[in-house]
Amino acid sequence: MAKKVIANIKLQIKAGKATPSPPIGPALGQHGVNIMEFCKAYNALTQSQEGMVIPVVITVYADRSFSFVTKTPPAAVLLKQAAKIAKGAGDPKRDKVGTVSAAQVREIADLKYKDLNAVNIEGAIKIIEGTARSMGIEISG
């Protein structure tokens, strides 16, 4: 018989930097999960992606055990990194804060494809292009 799931917790944590402080501690503590055990496992798994924000889905079971799945970094974070900017535009229709090439967009779409709700890679590229436009990033080429 399968374990009974009592909660699914979604967090975005910097890779290799999970600590018991908020937001991780309170989110896991209210379900009785061993916070340090999660932090050590998460940091070990995401050590190679240092500095990136990695979304994680934590499944908490009735016996207070847990499992977690990491996702690919958010498209906005990857686009900011590709355009070498700190943050998106406050008014994306008027202000353009950076530029990415079509090749960079395709590379990001390839990386994000498994987490996106897209039928094919062209659909994934359109999703990434839309995210870039909403951030005030222009796509060249």
From Swiss-Prot:
Gene3D superfamilies tied to this protein: Ribosomal protein L11, C-terminal domain, Ribosomal protein L11/L12, N-terminal domain
UniProt keyword annotations, A-Z: Methylation, Ribonucleoprotein, Ribosomal protein, RNA-binding, rRNA-binding
UniProt modification remark: One or more lysine residues are methylated.
GO biological process: translation
Recorded GO MF terms: large ribosomal subunit rRNA binding; structural constituent of ribosome
Listed InterPro entries: Ribosomal_uL11 (IPR000911), Ribosomal_uL11_bac-typ (IPR006519), Ribosomal_uL11_C (IPR020783), Ribosomal_uL11_C_sf (IPR036769), Ribosomal_uL11_CS (IPR020785), Ribosomal_uL11_N (IPR020784), Ribosomal_uL11_N_sf (IPR036796)
Top-level taxon of origin: Bacteria
Pfam families, sorted: Ribosomal_L11, Ribosomal_L11_N
One annotated Gene Ontology cellular component of this protein: cytosolic large ribosomal subunit
Role played: Forms part of the ribosomal stalk which helps the ribosome interact with GTP-bound translation factors.
HAMAP family noted in UniProt: Ribosomal_uL11
NCBIfam families: L11_bact
Family: Belongs to the universal ribosomal protein uL11 family.
Assembly description: Part of the ribosomal stalk of the 50S ribosomal subunit. Interacts with L10 and the large rRNA to form the base of the stalk. L10 forms an elongated spine to which L12 dimers bind in a sequential fashion forming a multimeric L10(L12)X complex.
UniProt protein name: Large ribosomal subunit protein uL11
Gene behind this protein: rplK
